[in-house]
């Protein structure tokens, strides 16, 4: 293990430790577990107030529902040739490259186009996938840029891809690096940007948005029932001193959330941190734009798999997938009109879940919801009334 301090981490040391009353309800601030560790009980020690990150090749990343993803996508990737020759897999959220590595290893003829908004993740994945360098194209881009990424890679934006994978949410690499500011269990700058080049940070939101905007973000993106109370206290607190670290926010949440609520329903900071992260990274609107583009990119008989880890994302996926598999024949007609059949069919009944064995190996998989579709019809086969 190794760790070199940055200026932001030096700030984290300076504000460490959190006050003991806060630690009473935020005990993980002393030890920082990785939610993708194989050992559910493993914890990363704090040295000088900074979590030490294991520099292993996979950075602790354990691909979620890997076998199920392979089972669902492989038929589309091997329909031309058993080794994947002629097939293209689009990984819209590459991360550490765990899912992509498996497909590339299993299918020596497969080509991969992979996107990630985080340049650090791309570099990690580039190293991990180096032995497949002649078959991969890595693109620094948010996943709502699928059409542009395909065009830049020499493919059409529509009907050119055989398989698509989305593994949504924040990655373990981002959670495990204190300077990124994603985790409420460690003191760090209030950043939360998945792309460090993006202009908006969590501190910007906390220090500049008005009370109504803050309450709306906490309620809409975090489903936080104490959103108004928290927003009011944020505004009062920043009038005295701006928010700079996650410890500042954790301390405020300890004061704002009633004691009974702090003791039940999971970590009391979870909803606020989720809301800020979603707002900083525009995650939900990005997903709303990305999924239609992904469906357009699929060739006939191509397949898409989406892994979502929180209900707001899963609702978007569920709604858009339901629209994709619906007939376009007017509901008052008794028969299906030619050319109005659904363009997609569902490959899962509801949302797929991890089993107990996988959850024990990989605790992050407990939250996952998997949904998958197959394209059955090309857009140009539809009627004029579409």
From Swiss-Prot:
Subcellular location(s) per record: Cytoplasm
Signal peptide annotation: none
Native species: Mycolicibacterium paratuberculosis (strain ATCC BAA-968 / K-10) (Mycobacterium paratuberculosis)
Q: Which SUPFAM superfamilies match?
A: Putative methyltransferase TM0872, insert domain, S-adenosyl-L-methionine-dependent methyltransferases
Keyword annotations for this protein, in alphabetical order, are:
Cytoplasm, Methyltransferase, rRNA processing, S-adenosyl-L-methionine, Transferase
Q: What is its main location?
A: cytoplasm
Q: Which family does it belong to?
A: Belongs to the methyltransferase superfamily. RsmH family.
Q: What is its EC number?
A: 2.1.1.199
Query: Binding positions for S-adenosyl-L-methionine?
Result: 97-99, 116, 143, 167, 174
Output the Gene Ontology cellular-component terms.
Answer: cytoplasm
This chain's protein is named Ribosomal RNA small subunit methyltransferase H
State the reactions this protein catalyses.
cytidine(1402) in 16S rRNA + S-adenosyl-L-methionine = N(4)-methylcytidine(1402) in 16S rRNA + S-adenosyl-L-homocysteine + H(+)
Q: Which is an annotated Pfam family here? A: Methyltransf_5
């Amino acid at each position: 293990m190794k760790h070199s301090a940055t200026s932001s981490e030096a700030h984290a040391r300076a504000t460490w430790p959190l006050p003991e009353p806060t630690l009473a309800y935020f005990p993980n601030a002393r030890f920082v577990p990785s939610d993708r560790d194989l050992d559910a009980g493993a914890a990363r020690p704090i040295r000088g107030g900074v979590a030490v990150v294991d520099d292993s090749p996979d950075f602790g990343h354990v691909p979620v529902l890997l076998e199920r993803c392979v089972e669902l996508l492989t038929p589309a990737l091997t329909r031309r040739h058993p080794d994947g020759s002629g097939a293209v897999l689009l990984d819209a959220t590459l991360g550490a490259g765990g899912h992509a590595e498996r497909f590339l290893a299993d299918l020596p003829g497969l080509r991969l186009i992979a996107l990630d908004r985080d340049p650090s993740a791309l570099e990690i994945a580039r190293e991990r996938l180096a032995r497949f360098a002649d078959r991969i194209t890595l693109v620094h881009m948010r996943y709502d840029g699928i059409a542009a990424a395909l065009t830049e890679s020499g493919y059409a934006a529509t009907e050119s891809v055989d398989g698509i994978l989305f593994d949504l949410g924040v990655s373990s690499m981002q959670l495990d690096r204190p300077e990124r500011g994603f985790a409420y269990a460690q003191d760090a700058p209030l950043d939360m940007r998945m792309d460090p080049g993006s202009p908006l940070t969590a501190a910007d939101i906390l220090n500049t948005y008005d009370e109504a905007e803050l309450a709306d973000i906490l309620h809409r993106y975090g489903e936080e029932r104490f959103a108004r109370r928290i927003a009011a206290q944020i505004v009062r607190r920043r009038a005295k001193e701006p928010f700079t670290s996650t410890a500042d926010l954790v301390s405020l949440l300890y004061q704002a959330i009633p004691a009974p609520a702090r003791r039940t329903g999971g970590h009391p900071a979870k909803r606020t941190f989720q809301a800020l992260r979603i707002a900083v990274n525009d995650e939900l609107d990005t997903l709303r734009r990305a999924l239609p583009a992904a469906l357009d990119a699929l060739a006939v008989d191509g397949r898409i798999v989406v892994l979502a880890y929180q209900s707001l994302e899963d609702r978007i996926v569920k709604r858009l997938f339901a629209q994709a598999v619906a007939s376009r024949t007017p509901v008052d007609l008794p028969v299906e009109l030619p050319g109005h059949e659904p363009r997609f069919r569902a490959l899962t009944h509801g949302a797929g879940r991890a089993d107990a064995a996988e959850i024990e190996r990989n605790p992050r998989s407990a939250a996952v919801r998997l949904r998958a579709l197959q394209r059955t019809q090309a857009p140009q086969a539809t009627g004029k009334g579409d």
